[in-house]
Design a protein with these regions (language model features):
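C-terminal motif of bacterial Sec signal peptides marking the signal peptidase cleavage site
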Residues: 21-24
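N-terminal pre-ligand scaffold of iron-sulfur
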Residues: 31-102, 135-159
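Bacterial signal peptide processing site
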Residues: 26-28
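Iron-sulfur (Fe-S) cluster-binding segments and ferredoxin-like electron-carrier domains
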Residues: 96-103, 114-123
Length: 159
């Protein structure tokens, strides 16, 4: 009789422990907020999603953590309304780890001082071998800017 009561107690306890452990799991479709002090970017399994409403003509910086590295990038709306995104690291000056700052309608390299019109960034380096905000491919879909985590991770060497 004691064995049956113990077995029932064990089964019930296991059931409740399972409920507690698995109730916090999200499905692959669910989006969870990645709340850091810089952004309200959201993350899914393979991509980062930034609400378009969050991107203005004032540059906003975002961080992505991987392999003990912080990959930093920024998003800004150009004067023509197009969204521009780039790594916060230059193709040449990245070893200095100084990134960019916004000065009016330009992004300025904090290392060498070169200025880049916001409307022109978000592409591959136009001056091969020179300073340029690192290219980060993005997709705009619905109300979100989407960034592949794989594209972020491919450029972790800059950071």
């Amino acid at each position: 009789m004691k064995k049956i009561i113990m077995l029932k107690s064990l089964i019930i306890t296991s059931f409740f422990i399972s409920l507690v452990l698995f109730s916090g799991c999200n499905s692959a479709e669910e989006v969870s907020a990645n709340t850091d002090s810089k952004s309200s970017a959201q993350t899914q399994i393979n991509q980062i999603m930034i609400p378009l409403s969050e991107i203005t003509e004032k540059a906003k910086w975002y961080d992505y953590e991987v392999d003990n590295k912080t990959i930093s990038y920024f998003a800004v709306k150009a004067s023509d309304g197009r969204i521009k995104v780039a790594f916060d690291a230059c193709d040449v000056c990245y070893p200095e780890k100084k990134g960019y700052r916004q000065l009016g309608s330009d992004m300025v390299c904090n290392n060498c001082g070169l200025k880049f019109a916001i409307g022109g960034i978000g592409t591959e380096n136009k001056a091969s071998g020179g300073c340029w905000p690192g290219y980060l491919p993005v997709i705009i879909e619905g109300d979100y800017l989407k960034i592949s985590k794989q594209n972020l991770e491919k450029s972790k060497w800059r950071f």
